[in-house]
UniProtKB/Swiss-Prot annotation:
UniProt xrefs under Gene3D superfamilies: Nucleic acid-binding proteins (2.40.50.140)
Any one Pfam family match given in the protein's UniProt record, by short name: Ribosomal_S17
Family matches, as NCBIfam families: PRK05610.1, uS17_bact
Keyword RNA-binding annotated: yes
One Gene Ontology biological process: translation
Location in or out of the cell: Plastid, Chloroplast
Keyword vocabulary terms for this entry: Chloroplast, Plastid, Ribonucleoprotein, Ribosomal protein, RNA-binding, rRNA-binding
The gene coding this protein: rps17
Coiled coil: none
Family: Belongs to the universal ribosomal protein uS17 family.
Name of the protein described by the UniProt record: Small ribosomal subunit protein uS17c
């Protein structure tokens, strides 16, 4: 089975080896058809702690690492300018 992958932006790097990644999806409203942006935050395991706030990263679903951590950071796609 292929693991799920998502692309998002790091919004918090305050924890050791852990990053909060915000992933935005654009969905159409069921009744009205208006396009809505929905953002979900994932807790991801960053082994080397290389990512910083604002970086665009790819995360992949994995086995549970802790109570809320089921994703690992695979790669940094784009570094933030700050």
């Amino acid at each position: 089975m292929v693991a799920k992958e998502k692309i998002g932006t790091v919004v918090s790097d305050k924890m050791l080896n852990t990053r909060i990644v915000a992933v935005s999806d654009r969905v159409s409203h069921k009744n009205y058809g208006k396009v809505i942006t929905r953002t979900k935050r994932y807790v991801a395991h960053d082994i080397e702690s290389n990512s910083k706030i604002g970086d665009k990263v790819k995360i992949q679903e994995t086995r549970p690492i802790s109570k809320s951590k089921n994703w690992i950071l695979v790669s940094i796609l784009e570094k933030s300018s700050t």
